[in-house]
Amino acid sequence: MEETVAFYQTVLGFTPTTQSAEYSIVERDGQTVHFMKAASEEVMKCVRGHTEIYIEVRDIHSLWEHVKSFRDRYKIRDLFDREYGMTEFHIGDPNECLIFVGEPTSR
């Protein structure tokens, strides 16, 4: 849990609001992400690498300038524009969750 919270705080700029070994919450721009410890290692093995989340942010370009410095530690897809009107980058977290980070292109 500590590694996950540290990733969201250090890399993506979230602020921890609740933190324990079993359950933690981080917040950024009024959005929260909740983390719960897996029921067992077997459950974790089943979901590892099969989870995706989408986080909408403000000022993606300044966040991207920070995040791209972690290329040597995490799998990252560079900032790009999507056909559905979002500017995004993608990053894998320490638990192999794929995180889509985006902002409406028109902002």
Cite the ranges covered by each PLM segment:
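Vicinal oxygen chelate
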Residues: 1, 53-98
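Amphipathic alpha-helical segments
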Residues: 2-15
